[in-house]
């Protein structure tokens, strides 16, 4: 099991496996190659919903809608417009991504149950359009005559593409997508996705725009599903709305959950399982979804991290767990330069709060608060529970927009600006409970915010889930310096 996890996490080994499959495809039955192609299409679908749900935390119950848009767009482009196959795939990918970007607008304003219902509605709308637009999609009778590798009518610049060649093209595309996704989730942008998933409020306090992350997540997710749809259309050669109904959306989500939400390798496990499982359940076709339900119950109960959690290898940085913290004095570099600069500006008011009022549905939490925060000084806010201390901090940091009043930072009014804009200007806040990403190392959590001295040298690559509570809080606080 550990060896399987290593294969899917190592670029060279993954490339060698792809070459072996590409060569082996020419020596196995056509039906087997066809199944392998289905596996890759399902991997693309699973990776798409994983970017949206597993990494950025936006649940989707209508992902088959993006799948359908890509399939019909590519089929129409080739069949009706005579567009070359590669161009048709590009149109399918960017067309579905554009729809995802449009959907991100209203979807970004709702959460949890309402987000699930909105995504469900999107999937149902696409399904009904595919049924009713008979002149475009063929309606319930389906769209026939699509250039297909299965029947030998698909060509790329004059070259005929058979089932084996089609699989090899899919394999190359999958390899490129996997490498791009792996690099993406390790980048600053990928860390921003995880931050929004864990806590949108904390992400905003780090200068991360939640709206921008959601737009990117919907666009990437929709694009991957559209790419999968384009490949599906030209492999089957026939499209019907029933291939993109509600149950298809549920299958895609279940596939990702079983594999392991948030794990790129887990999506491969889930796709392989849910490509071959229906073949084994054909004798129990009437009970297929009961079996799916039982699998979900099993996963949620015994394997909450999915198959990826079962197969995940032990982190190669586990040796850091045995290290002891260095003396606090040794870990802290001198701050004399910063302190001297602070003294020089000590008479200046960096933040000025003027007559700020904050009301929640008529309940006044802040009533004309005014104060100044000066450079180089420490200001304490004291009061009993419910007196509005946290509300004032939230208003200053942009989490709440004040009902009235002004908040000046370096002479500019920042009242009402979103929290990520306030953080980018230079004002951030910490939280009583550490809101970092548990699966990230300390270093990765620090990198989500401005890099500063952390005093965490013994734990630079240790998962914060296993770090002591005080150290987790310190890591979270230092990332906002």
Describe the function of each predicted region:
Residues 405-412, 425:
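Conserved ABC transporter NBD signature motif
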Residues 397:
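Helix-to-loop junction immediately C-terminal to a conserved catalytic motif
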Residues 1-333:
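Transmembrane alpha-helices and adjacent helix-loop boundaries
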Residues 390-391:
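Conserved Walker
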Residues 351-353, 366:
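Conserved structural motif at the start of ABC-family nucleotide-binding domains
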Residues 379-384:
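The feature captures the beta-strand-to-loop junction immediately N-terminal to the Walker
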Residues 440-481:
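ABC-family P-loop ATPase nucleotide-binding domains
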């Amino acid at each position: 099991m550990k060896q399987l996890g290593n294969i899917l996490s190592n670029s060279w080994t993954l490339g060698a496996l792809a070459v072996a499959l590409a060569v082996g495809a020419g020596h196995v039955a056509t039906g087997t190659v066809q199944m392998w192609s289905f596996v890759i299409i399902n991997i693309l679908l699973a990776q798409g919903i994983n970017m949206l749900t597993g990494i950025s935390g936006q649940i989707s119950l209508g992902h088959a809608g993006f799948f359908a848009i890509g399939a019909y767009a590519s089929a129409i482009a080739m069949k009706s417009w005579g567009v070359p196959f590669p161009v048709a795939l590009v149109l399918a990918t960017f067309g579905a991504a554009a729809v995802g970007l449009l959907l991100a607008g209203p979807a970004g304003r709702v959460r949890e149950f309402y987000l699930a219902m909105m995504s469900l509605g999107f999937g149902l709308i696409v399904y009904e359009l595919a049924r009713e637009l008979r002149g475009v999609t063929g309606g319930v009778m389906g769209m026939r005559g699509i250039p297909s590798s299965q029947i030998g009518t698909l060509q790329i610049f004059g070259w005929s593409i058979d089932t084996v060649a089609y699989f090899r093209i899919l394999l190359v595309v999958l390899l490129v997508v996997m490498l791009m996704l792996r690099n993406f989730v390790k980048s600053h942008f990928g860390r921003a996705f995880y931050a929004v998933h864990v806590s949108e409020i904390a992400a905003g306090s780090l200068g991360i725009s939640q709206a921008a992350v959601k737009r990117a997540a919907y666009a990437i997710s929709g694009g991957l599903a559209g790419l999968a749809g384009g490949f599906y259309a030209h492999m089957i050669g026939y499209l019907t709305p029933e291939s993109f109904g509600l149950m298809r959306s549920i299958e895609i989500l279940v596939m990702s959950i079983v594999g392991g939400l948030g794990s790129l390798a887990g999506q491969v496990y889930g796709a392989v399982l849910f490509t071959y499982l229906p073949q084994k359940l054909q004798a129990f076709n009437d009970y297929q979804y009961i079996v799916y339900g039982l699998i979900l119950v099993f996963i949620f109960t015994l394997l909450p991290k999915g198959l990826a959690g079962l197969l995940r290898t032990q982190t190669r940085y586990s040796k850091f767990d045995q290290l002891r913290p260095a003396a606090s004095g040794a870990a802290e570099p001198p701050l004399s330069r910063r302190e001297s600069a602070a003294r020089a500006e000590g008479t200046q008011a960096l933040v000025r709060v003027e007559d700020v009022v904050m009301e929640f549905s008529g309940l006044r939490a802040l009533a004309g608060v005014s104060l100044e925060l000066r450079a180089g000084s420490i200001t304490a806010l004291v009061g009993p529970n419910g007196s509005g201390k946290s509300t004032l901090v939230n208003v200053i940091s942009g989490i709440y927009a004040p009902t009235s009043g002004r908040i000046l930072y370096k002479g500019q009014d920042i009242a009402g600006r979103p929290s990520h804009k306030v953080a980018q200007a230079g004002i951030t806040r910490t939280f009583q409970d550490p809101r970092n990403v548990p699966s990230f190392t300390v270093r990765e959590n620090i990198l989500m915010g401005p890099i500063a001295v952390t005093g965490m040298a013994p734990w630079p690559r240790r998962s914060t889930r296993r770090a002591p509570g005080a150290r987790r809080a310190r890591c979270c606080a230092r990332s906002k310096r």
